[in-house]
């Protein structure tokens, strides 16, 4: 089994890469869904403040790898030789996945400059997004405090996402296709 996980700063293109993977028929597990589910379970409004608070509390109470731990059973139950995990946020999550899943774990970082990322945030309209570049910087700092920088440094491959969607899609398809070719067919 191969697990490909995407890591990157907010709005760098992780979810877009995961969407491309899904279009290619690769099952996707979204780590952010774990947080959004917990926000909903607690009866909170799904905004940036609440999702950030819940994510921080989970990591404080259950460990910095709490979200990864909650994803392990989903990964094992997916029944596929290749799975994409969207949204690694810290090095503890990387270490958890590598420990639990072994050498089949591949980490791909996605990079985009903050100005491009903020432009994307303004267009996507998610309820947990921030509405100023300062808000994005604050979210960056929060995620860096979780070990995001170290997770990015631990990646096996980097994909730059600072051009058009078509170029990014081509790059993602190329990388994922290499792993699809290496995976036994069912």
UniProtKB/Swiss-Prot annotation:
Binding site for ATP: 8-15
Coiled coil spans: none
Keyword hit for Nucleotide-binding: yes
Keywords: ATP-binding, Nucleotide-binding
Pfam families linked to this entry: AAA_17 (PF13207)
An MF annotation (GO) of this entry: ATP binding
Signal sequence interval, chain numbering: none
Family statement: Belongs to the UPF0200 family.
Entry-linked HAMAP family: UPF0200 (MF_01111)
Protein name: UPF0200 protein Mbar_A0975
